[in-house]
Amino acid sequence: MNNQPILQVQEVTKAFGGVIAVNRVSLDVNEGEILGIIGPNGSGKTTLINCITGFIKMTSGKIFFRGKDITGKPVHKIADMGITRTFQIMRPYYSLPCYKNLVIPLFSPRAKRTGGWRGGGKLGDRDTVSIDILEEIGFERDSFVPYKLASTLPTGYLKRLELARCLAVKPEIIICDEIFSGLSMSEIASMVPLIERLQMDGITLIMIEHRLRELFRVSKRILVLNFGEKVIEGTPEEIMADEKVKEVYFGSEEVEEVMSHA
């Protein structure tokens, strides 16, 4: 790793008509870290990552990936650089078997160049690679689950399928939009070590999350947004101790509840 942030967001603003959803937000993401982004509903979290990933065009500002200006680049160009994401509302190909959901991204130019996740620069049989990835993120290889239609999967498996589709292209950054939402406590308990393992494998993660306890476990640096503006950036301990954050986001009772289980 070098000292330059892998991703730099500079003074990004996004306005929808007269409504400013994101207002001059700047942040640096260090290679290999897990950066958490939190804030109340409507605070601009998803809009910010939509700007980063090219899903919407920002009003002003700059975004750099490994020092290269990627401002205004289309979604497929940004994905080809290795910046991938999951969605709060999951978007699998519901009519296809799970493993076929991975075969499609394995046809991408990036997957062909890199060999896909664990590919070592050479892409093998796509069906086999798909099953290998699914097994690694928690699908039982010898069960029927990888071959089931995505439409039949419960939420826990769909969340893992979202991550698997990101891994298929051997990403450098995965942006997770509420990966813990809708999961049972046991599903969350098994998802946390998976996130930690992805970081150990060298992937940089940006996590938008409402499940604070779990986020604070995996992330050492948190950014708080409110009304489209950055409130504070710091460690989980600094975030929970900040009086302004308590007022605008948590409420003192919620902070105390999270702290008591930290």
Segments (PLM) and residue ranges:
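The feature captures the beta-strand-to-loop junction immediately N-terminal to the Walker
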Residues: 38-40
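Helix-to-loop junction immediately C-terminal to a conserved catalytic motif
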Residues: 53
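Conserved ABC transporter NBD signature motif
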Residues: 61-68, 81, 134, 147
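Conserved catalytic motifs of ABC-family nucleotide-binding domains
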Residues: 170
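Catalytic Walker B motif of ABC-type/P-loop ATPase nucleotide-binding domains
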Residues: 174-177
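A short, surface-exposed alpha-helical micro-motif characterized by mixed small hydrophobic
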Residues: 215-217
